[in-house]
Amino acid sequence: MTCINLPARTGQQFSISHGDYEAVITELGATMRKLTYKGEDLTVALGPDDLVTCCHGQILIPFPNRIEGGEYTFEGKTYSLPIDEHDRNTAIHGYGYRSFWKLISLAEDAVTLAWRSPNMVGYPFDLYVTATYSLADDGMHLTVSAYNNGDTNAPWALAIHPWLANSLNGYGDEIDEHNAKCSLTLPARTHVTVDENLIPTGTEPVDGTKYDLREDTLLTEQPFDDAWTDLEHAEDGSVTAVFTRADGKKVRVGGDETITSFQVCTGTKFPAFQHPA
């Protein structure tokens, strides 16, 4: 058998660095495969040939979350998407993470990748999306831009999906115990309610509930796989959630005025091979 020098299963690997920060972004899904500070993982690291479980580190476009039965209506027309979460009968997290993105530019501290939506059943719209990862003194910055190349309006939404490292590197049943040593501050007034298939059903105020994380809160009342909205933005439009790891180090996740919600998943009951903590 002839040996072939194959690329990694996640495609080309784009390494960037700035000061004490280093990251690896992959061609597959524009995935942030690894992010470290002074050599220590800030996100759960993946190998270049590993199975990317739970959309770890990926960009969720043209829609995040779940669409019940794979059907949605946009401007009076109903579209049917392929079902890819069969136990809940939903379409989940879009298609950008399944594709190899095109490299646009690469510098020592930044990389830009691009993706064009294929003409597919259930989403015939023509989007061109760019994602720029850049490292600076204060960490990782991600800028995503979307362009509609079609002659009609296009439905579009975006989320990012990093799994933050809690510093204890636990698996399976260890995750809840380890997360209980961590805390979270999340500036949101409203919690999103869901049905048994995690389809949103409405909203409720967080006041007086375990979902009020506006003050630093230990993650002992688990599990969470929940969304929050009605965010408390600062005067400059920014909003930031703060995750304090078991070792006391703080990881800040935030954005500008375009950020409308946060999702928190604690990885409870995830099988060990998925390792999201």
Report residues per predicted region.
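Acidic, contiguous internal or C-terminal segments within carbohydrate-active enzymes
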Residues: 16, 23, 117-164, 168-171
